[in-house]
């Protein structure tokens, strides 16, 4: 049944709220949890759900993301029965170039989707941390005879201001949609996960864009139009672990949760693996001066200091006398001697000089950017 469904991952966003961490790379390529990048979770969900063909729509700073995805072999997408295709903006005969929003990105890739000839289109965001069976959502979509099914989670009133919110009837049919309301009428928030009947969506996009060049987003344009036209739109409630890591604080929190043995993400589940691009690296090395407490230290790390409740990604070096607490250090970062890092996110390949102090709080996480150098005298 899954072969009738094509997966499209929207991975072109700039991620401006992550500041320096996405200055030179796309948000889905940001490292997470020591061994992964954010997009690994969505790609792995597709692989585990039996979604064999996936298109990844990229745009902003795509080079690192494209290299990470490669042929898709790390997720099993290099077989004869499927594959992964990176879809980038291009100039058409109509002069179209960059994607203006989620719906516009799908419209611009109609030709690719038509080549796959799916009955259902699964549209996903490439910047969330979660594990989800999309096949179960497809079965729900079919049982409801829906035209569109939206994945939803329950959120607080305060959180609702950041999401598209939905009101439903007793059968979970969506009767009203509000984009980031000040006073939400329900607690059901869109996860940015959609299953469309492709012929219906295709017809809508072609007709709408022919008359309205401002067509941009699913939340702003498509869902309200579906509801206005009395299409059958249903909410699919997801009850597992799901995190939107679009802000510095939420990215830090999700990494700290990752350290907990009671984390609902259950990364050790052998029946639902999270895959990533494999690198052949030497083992980590802990010197006699090192101390590691409730931390994750992965391949090719060198540690001569103290690591407490933190994540050290691949190829991180921590000098003697340094202390890293409640922090996530991204791949390739170099930390000198007698450094204090507390409540911080340290970007990929950053360099922290001797005696530096990078100290944040739970409410204001300290950040060192991608390839940024701090506390080192420049020649």
Curated annotation (Swiss-Prot):
GO biological process: glycogen biosynthetic process
Catalytic activity: alpha-D-glucose 1-phosphate + ATP + H(+) = ADP-alpha-D-glucose + diphosphate
Record keywords, A-Z: ATP-binding, Carbohydrate metabolism, Glycogen biosynthesis, Glycogen metabolism, Nucleotide-binding, Nucleotidyltransferase, Transferase
Enzyme Commission identifier(s): 2.7.7.27
Binding annotation for alpha-D-glucose 1-phosphate: 164, 179-180, 190
Pfam families: Hexapep_GlmU (PF24894), NTP_transferase (PF00483)
Entry GO MF terms: ATP binding; glucose-1-phosphate adenylyltransferase activity
Pathway: Glycan biosynthesis; glycogen biosynthesis
Stated role: Involved in the biosynthesis of ADP-glucose, a building block required for the elongation reactions to produce glycogen. Catalyzes the reaction between ATP and alpha-D-glucose 1-phosphate (G1P) to produce pyrophosphate and ADP-Glc.
Subunit structure as annotated in this protein's UniProt entry: Homotetramer.
Family note: Belongs to the bacterial/plant glucose-1-phosphate adenylyltransferase family.
Record-given protein name: Glucose-1-phosphate adenylyltransferase
